[in-house]
Regions:
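N-terminal propeptides/low-complexity segments immediately following signal peptides
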Residues: 23-27
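Sec/Tat signal peptide C-region and signal peptidase I cleavage site
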Residues: 15-21
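Compact alpha-helical subdomains of small soluble proteins
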Residues: 70-127
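Bacterial N-terminal signal peptides
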Residues: 4-14
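Short N-proximal segments of mature Sec-exported proteins
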Residues: 28-93
Length: 127
């Protein structure tokens, strides 16, 4: 019994420590999102997410929209937007926003947040 214990201890100590070390995968390159205009936001909101950059753009679009709406609601004099119940899917609304931006060339260069609030007020007016 003692021999088996010593043998196992020697076997464990003699085995190479790094034999099964996991391989490190290369770090992905950073994704830069610099969206300022309604046109840039429209592009981000309609990208097909087939890569990390595509997923990042789509996630940015959704987070941007949510952040703009929440911030605007904190302002007592903010934009009057009344969402129906049940609310439409965010992806559908953001595609509508992109179509709205692309329907008028002058909208593409507007500040993204301003254009988004204008779209939302027109799309979901309070009556």
């Amino acid at each position: 019994m003692r021999f088996i214990l010593v043998f196992c201890l020697v076997l464990v100590c003699a085995s190479p420590i790094h034999a099964a070390a996991p391989t490190k995968s290369p770090k992905p390159s950073p994704i830069s999102l610099n969206i300022r205009t309604a046109g840039e936001l429209a592009n981000a909101c309609t990208v097909t997410p087939t890569s990390q950059a595509g997923f990042a753009q789509l996630n940015f679009c959704n987070g941007f929209a949510q952040g703009v709406l929440q911030t605007d609601r904190q302002n007592p004099n903010g934009t009057k937007i009344c969402m129906p119940s049940p609310s439409p899917k965010r992806s559908v609304t953001m595609k509508e926003f992109a179509s709205w931006v692309r329907a008028d060339v002058s909208r593409k260069d507007e500040v993204a947040s301003v254009a988004f609030l204008r779209f939302m007020a027109g799309r979901f007016p309070c009556t």
